[in-house]
Regions:
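Residue-level recognition of beta-strand termini and adjacent short loop/turns
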Residues: 105-107, 236, 300
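A structural "hinge/loop" feature
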Residues: 37-57, 68-69, 77, 125-128, ...
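N-terminal lobe/hinge region of extracytoplasmic solute-binding protein
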Residues: 34-103, 288
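A C-terminal, polar beta->alpha supersecondary segment
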Residues: 264-268, 272-274, 657-694
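N-terminal export signals
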Residues: 1-18
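Extracytoplasmic/lumenal ectodomains and periplasmic regions of secretory and membrane proteins
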Residues: 635, 640-663, 667-668
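Aromatic-residue-lined binding/catalytic grooves and analogous aromatic/hydrophobic interfacial grooves
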Residues: 236-239, 249, 261
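Extracytoplasmic/periplasmic ligand-capture domains
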Residues: 15-24, 69-70, 113-180, 205-233, ...
């Protein structure tokens, strides 16, 4: 028996591997990937507004529109809607105007959006009814939920058809004070009546909660259906009417975001029951949607599984793209039904190095879905040597690259007394000089052009990315005069001497307070736990501030804690990025619009920047179609923020994805968030490749055998010596 156990141990030793998945998982029709941060905080389509969350939200929820996965420039396509529509315009008397009517004549823009008939919600207990038509699980008493932590632990699951009223209800949810609603400030400026609706719902919510404990986890269901919203009406079951205040061309793009995806009232009623919050049952973990996938496994900070939605509508892979797509094999699946895979499995791997190694071994089909820098990172590795390049080519790693509309920047909290706006004209002048000095000192060209090339890009000169209408980034002679200058026809970063002068104007000569002599210490609120590779980037940033004599203190937290900090306005200097929601300058300029303040209005202006003239121009920009007037307004807004320097601008990142050779149809595209539905996996190729790349490791067996032989020889010699000694003693 001991011999059998030993043989088994040796066999296991030879066959062991570091696959994070069960044996045989590679043979399944499943897409495997990693996530490096904590689990997503918000999967509720009303609340979700981060790139890691979008990996799941856009596959589970379906807004009216989406983006063609292959065409560039980006092209809108219908998703939950039957078609992409143009608005019509009304004057103050409700009379219809021509499409080219002047903006000052337009009182309303009306979108009549046909909803696809036959759309069904994913299976969920919220829809289950008994024989009398009564909801089975809408009247749970305390304790009845038990230890159930997933909707799929309920006996009865059901569905129903999606109707226009579900889209109306979703828009109303942006007024619910119990939900995180980051775009409510934007929507309330445009959707007719939404601003008043916010006040109404807040008042009714307060009434409902009167007398209840403030920290009550399971608040009663706030039924938004009882209060009408003028700007969102269901004309019939399959026609949604949205009314906007005046012309707002960018609304078509908002219709392609999760914020306009339908939500069933039954889900809110279901989750607003005793015990749900304690058991982590909510739309933020178990959203109800109409998309190709549904969340079927959620293990906090460890593993998420999306499975094929059995109720998903008929959908097919596109048959056209842009030049080069056919040659790259991206049209080979023309007309085939999607999604291709049955499951999408994401596992938590904390650091980039192990993610990269798992990808190289074939265990991950792609590193991370939401990160557009993995292709850049691996391309740097590939080009490091001929040997590595040959290795990459032999394994067939796909690294498609592009320059996309996304950015990374260092921001200053406008509410902070040192780096923010300042309370007096004199303080405002000093703080602005400090921000400008820092903006000059941080050499983005060095950091993310030469050192951290795996995350690299081009230094930014303002908030408007190249590739959208009106952008001047990268054009000859175009630069930020605060941070750069023209030398012999070449744009160069201003010398540190210019930054030193600004430090003196700010009252910090040599990095010390001119009045007290104390060193200037600033806090850098970092949104991730610092790993060794992230430490290198942070150390580089510390050196940039040290050029000015400024001490930079790193205050690192995980992403969820960072979000809490910025909501309270407790941050000072921070690192942030933005992947465009839609291909328009407004989607970047709104990050600096005052009413979108993150800490004051829970918007996406994380710097809490406020400038009345910038805000006035932003409001004007919103009603302008692409043309000379819009370009002029954009230029003026660019000039304002360059002078104010609420951001240190950072860089425009390169976009590059990474796929195994057996993953088909992958293409970079920052606004295409529903990529998983289009990806096809050749499981047979994956199975063969993983077996070939990760064969049994025999050297431990050899070492074991050599060690065993040495022990045997040593034991034999000792035994022989003892026998000889015994024989010698006996002869005496």
């Amino acid at each position: 028996m001991k011999a059998g156990m030993g043989a088994a141990s040796l066999a296991l030793l030879a066959a062991c591997n570091n696959s994070p998945f069960p044996r045989g998982a590679e043979r399944e029709n499943t897409l495997y990937m990693a996530f490096a941060e904590r689990s997503p905080r918000y999967l509720d389509p009303t609340s979700s507004y981060t790139a890691p969350e979008s990996t799941y939200v856009y596959e589970i929820s379906e807004p009216p529109y989406g983006y063609h996965p292959l065409k560039r420039p980006y092209t809108l396509i219908p998703r939950a809607a039957a078609e992409v529509v143009k608005p019509y315009f009304l004057d103050k008397q409700g009379q219809r105007l021509p499409d080219d009517a002047p903006g000052d004549q337009i009182a309303e823009a009306v979108y009549d959006i046909p909803i696809r008939p036959g759309l069904k919600w994913s299976p969920h207990p919220a829809f289950a009814k008994d024989a009398r038509g009564q909801y089975l699980y809408h009247r749970l008493k305390p304790g009845e939920l038990g230890d159930r932590r997933s909707p799929f632990e309920f006996k009865q699951l059901a569905t129903r058809e999606v109707v226009a009223e579900d889209f109306v209800y979703a828009l109303k949810r942006h007024a619910n004070p119990r939900l995180e609603a980051p775009v409510a400030p934007v929507f309330s400026e445009h959707v007719l009546g939404l601003k008043d609706y916010l006040a109404t719902v807040k008042r009714e919510s307060d009434k409902q909660l009167a007398g209840l404990p403030e920290n009550l986890p399971d608040k009663p269901f706030l039924d938004l259906r009882q209060w009408p919203l003028a700007g969102a009406v269901a004309v019939n079951d399959h026609l949604l009417r949205i009314r906007l205040k005046g012309r707002y061309p960018q609304w078509q793009y908002w219709l392609a975001t999760n914020f306009t995806a339908p939500v069933p009232w039954e889900a809110d009623a279901f989750y607003a029951q005793p015990g749900m919050a304690a058991n982590s049952m909510s739309m933020n973990r178990w959203p109800v949607g109409t998309g190709p996938f549904m969340m079927t496994e959620y293990v906090q900070d460890r593993r998420h599984v999306m499975s094929r939605n059995p109720n998903y509508r008929p959908d097919t892979y596109p048959c056209e793209g842009e030049p080069g797509d056919a040659e790259a094999g991206r049209l080979a699946d023309c007309g085939k039904p999607v999604p291709f895979v049955d499951k999408v499995v994401a596992i938590n791997v904390k650091e980039r190095v192990p993610i990269k190694e798992l990808f190289k071994q074939g265990y991950l089909d792609l590193p991370e879905m939401d990160r557009a820098d993995w292709g850049v990172n691996l391309a740097v590795d590939r080009d490091d040597s001929d040997e590595v390049k040959a290795f990459f080519e032999q394994r067939g790693f796909q690294l498609p690259m592009t320059v996309d509309i996304s950015n990374w920047y260092l921001g200053f909290n406008w509410m902070d007394p040192v780096v923010g706006q300042g309370d007096t004209p004199e303080q405002q002048k000093r703080n602005r000089a400090l921000r400008q000095a820092i903006s000059i000192a941080i050499d983005w060209e060095e950091g993310y052009g030469r050192i951290f090339r795996d995350k690299g890009g081009d230094a930014a000169h303002g908030p408007i990315p190249p590739g959208v209408f009106g952008a001047k980034e990268g054009q000859p002679g175009e630069f930020n005069p605060v941070t750069h200058r023209l030398v012999h026809g070449k744009v160069e970063r201003r010398p540190l001497e210019d930054a030193y002068k600004l430090m003196e104007q700010a009252g910090y000569p040599g990095g010390r307070d001119a009045k007290t002599g104390k060193p200037l210490v600033l806090n850098y609120d970092f949104q991730r736990v610092v790993t060794p590779e992230l430490k290198a980037e942070n150390d580089w940033l510390i050196r940039q501030f040290a050029k000015l004599g400024i001490q930079l203190d790193i205050r690192a937290t995980d992403f969820n804690q960072f979000q809490e900090k910025i909501l309270k306005g407790k941050h000072q200097i921070f690192w942030w990025g933005w992947f465009a929601d839609y291909p328009d300058a407004e989607n970047f300029l709104f990050l600096l619009y005052g009413p979108n303040s993150k800490s004051q209005h829970e918007g996406e202006n994380t710097a809490n920047y406020l400038n009345p003239e910038f805000d006035r121009l932003y409001r004007k920009l919103q009603s302008l179609e692409d043309g000379p007037e819009k370009a002029d307004v954009m230029a003026k807004m660019n000039d304002i923020v360059r002078q104010d320097a609420p951001w240190a601008w950072g860089y425009w990142s390169y976009s590059g994805l990474a796929f195994q050779r057996w993953v088909h149809n992958g293409k970079p595209g920052v606004v295409v968030r529903d990529r998983a539905r289009y990806l096809r996996v050749d499981a047979e190729d994956r199975t063969r490749s993983i077996a070939a790349w990760n064969g049994p490791v025999w050297w431990p067996l050899l070492a074991f055998a050599v060690g065993g032989l040495a022990i045997f020889i040593g034991t034999r010699r000792a035994w022989a010596k003892r026998e000889a000694a015994t024989a010698l003693g006996g002869s005496r």
